C-alpha cells in the first residue's frame, strides 16, 4: 500500500478517472471482491481527495460494515443485521490506504472476531476514504457515531473505538468535533484504543514534504514533483493534523513548523496506546530511528518535547511491542 502511495504522481492521479471501469460494482454498494476493495482503498489513500472532488465512482463513501456487509445506521438496518447485538459496540477504524479487511489481513478471524468470542461485544467496522482530510473524516465519523448509538438495537452501555494508524487520528478528531457539538454519544464512550497512531506525525510524510519543496527549486523538475501529488490525508500525517484549522492556514509551498491546535484527550474516557518497534528494546538505535518502520515510538506513545502537546496517558495503558512492525499491530496475537 505504502509503495503505491509513495509512487503516485500527477499522471496516475489523472488516470484514476478511468479506473472505475475495472470494478463491476460501485464502491458504495458493497459489491466487488476483497482484492478489488483493497485496490480501491489504496487508490483512495493516494489521491482520494481528487477522486471525491471529481465525482469519481472510486471515491469510497464513509460506511459501516458488519460481517462483510455494508449497512446503514438506520434502526431497521441495524436491527435486521444485528439481531443479537450486545450493549457494547466496538467500532474499528482502519488506517491510510486500507479498508476493513486490514483487520483480518490473512482472511482469517481477526481482532474483532476474537473480541466477539471472548467478550460480550459487537464489532462494527468503518470503511472510509483515507485521502480526505482527517478533520473531514472526523466530523463525518462524529455524526455517524451519533446515529449508530441512537439507533443501536439495544441501549448502548459502553462504546469502544479502536483505530489503527491514521484511524486513531480520525477517532480523536471525531471526539473533538462531537464534544464541541455536545453530542450525546460521548456519554456512552468509555474506551479509545490507538494502535501505531502517529499522534505527532510520521517521518515519511515529513520527508515527502521536504522532497516536494526541494523539487520545486530545481529547474524542469516540476513535472516530476511526486510529493505534490500526495493526498490531503497523507499531508495531514506530517504533524498529525486533527482540525480544519491545522491545515487550512498552511502554505504547502513552504516548510512551516507544527502549528496544530491543542486537542486534549476527553475526560472520563480510558485511552490505550499500542506502539511497535523493529528493535529488541527502546534503547537500540534502529528502534529509535525507525520505530515500526512508519511511526516512531514517541509519536505512537503521545510523547512530545513540548509538554503542552504531549498526551499524558497512564503508563499502564501504554504498551510497546518489540521486534514488530506497523502492520503487526493489526494481527499479532500478542497485541490482541
For each predicted feature, which ranges?
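Flexible, membrane-associating and regulatory peripheral segments of lipid-active enzymes
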Residues: 1-126, 136, 151
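Helical cap/lid subdomain of alpha/beta-hydrolase-fold lipid enzymes
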Residues: 32-36, 40, 48-51, 176-336
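A Trp-anchored, charged/polar loop motif used as the substrate-binding/catalytic surface
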Residues: 67-80, 106, 144-149, 243-263
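The conserved beta1-alpha1 loop
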Residues: 91-95, 164-165, 196, 292
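Alpha/beta-hydrolase active-site loop
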Residues: 132-151
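Alpha/beta-hydrolase fold nucleophile elbow
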Residues: 153-164
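Glycine-rich nucleophile elbow surrounding the catalytic serine of serine-hydrolase chemistry
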Residues: 162-176, 200
Amino acid at each position: 500500500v505504502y509503495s503505491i502511495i509513495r509512487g503516485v504522481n500527477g499522471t496516475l492521479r489523472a488516470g484514476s478517472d478511468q479506473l472505475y471501469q475495472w470494478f463491476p460494482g460501485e464502491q458504495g454498494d458493497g459489491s466487488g471482491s476483497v482484492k478489488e476493495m483493497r485496490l480501491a482503498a489504496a487508490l483512495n489513500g493516494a489521491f482520494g481527495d481528487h477522486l471525491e472532488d471529481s465525482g469519481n465512482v472510486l471515491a469510497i463513501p464513509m460506511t459501516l460494515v458488519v460481517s462483510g456487509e455494508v449497512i446503514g445506521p438506520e434502526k431497521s438496518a441495524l436491527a435486521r443485521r444485528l439481531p443479537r447485538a450486545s450493549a457494547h459496540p466496538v467500532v474499528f477504524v482502519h488506517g491510510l490506504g486500507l479498508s476493513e479487511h486490514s483487520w483480518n489481513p490473512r482472511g482469517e478471524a481477526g481482532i474483532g472476531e476474537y473480541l466477539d468470542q471472548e467478550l460480550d461485544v459487537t464489532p462494527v467496522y468503518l470503511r472510509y476514504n483515507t485521502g480526505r482530510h482527517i478533520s473531514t473524516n472526523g466530523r463525518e465519523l462524529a455524526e455517524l457515531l451519533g446515529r449508530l448509538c441512537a439507533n443501536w438495537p439495544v441501549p448502548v452501555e459502553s462504546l469502544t473505538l479502536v483505530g489503527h494508524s491514521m484511524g486513531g487520528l480520525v477517532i480523536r478528531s471525531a471526539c473533538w468535533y462531537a464534544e464541541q457539538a455536545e453530542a450525546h454519544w460521548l456519554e456512552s464512550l468509555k474506551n479509545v484504543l490507538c494502535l501505531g497512531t502517529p499522534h505527532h506525525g510520521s517521518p515519511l510524510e515529513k520527508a515527502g514534504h521536504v522532497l516536494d519543496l526541494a523539487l520545486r527549486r530545481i529547474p524542469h523538475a516540476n513535472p516530476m514533483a511526486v510529493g505534490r501529488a500526495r493526498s490531503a490525508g497523507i499531508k495531514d500525517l506530517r504533524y498529525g493534523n486533527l482540525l480544519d484549522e491545522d491545515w487550512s492556514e498552511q502554505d504547502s509551498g513552504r516548510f512551516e513548523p507544527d502549528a496544530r491546535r491543542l486537542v486534549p484527550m476527553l475526560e472520563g474516557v480510558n485511552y490505550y496506546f499500542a506502539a511497535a518497534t523493529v528493535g529488541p528494546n527502546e534503547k537500540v538505535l534502529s528502534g529509535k530511528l525507525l520505530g515500526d518502520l512508519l511511526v516512531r515510538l514517541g509519536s505512537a506513545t503521545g510523547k512530545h518535547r513540548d509538554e503542552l502537546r504531549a498526551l499524558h496517558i497512564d503508563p499502564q495503558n501504554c504498551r510497546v511491542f518489540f521486534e514488530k512492525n506497523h502492520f503487526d499491530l493489526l494481527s499479532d496475537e500478542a497485541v490482541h
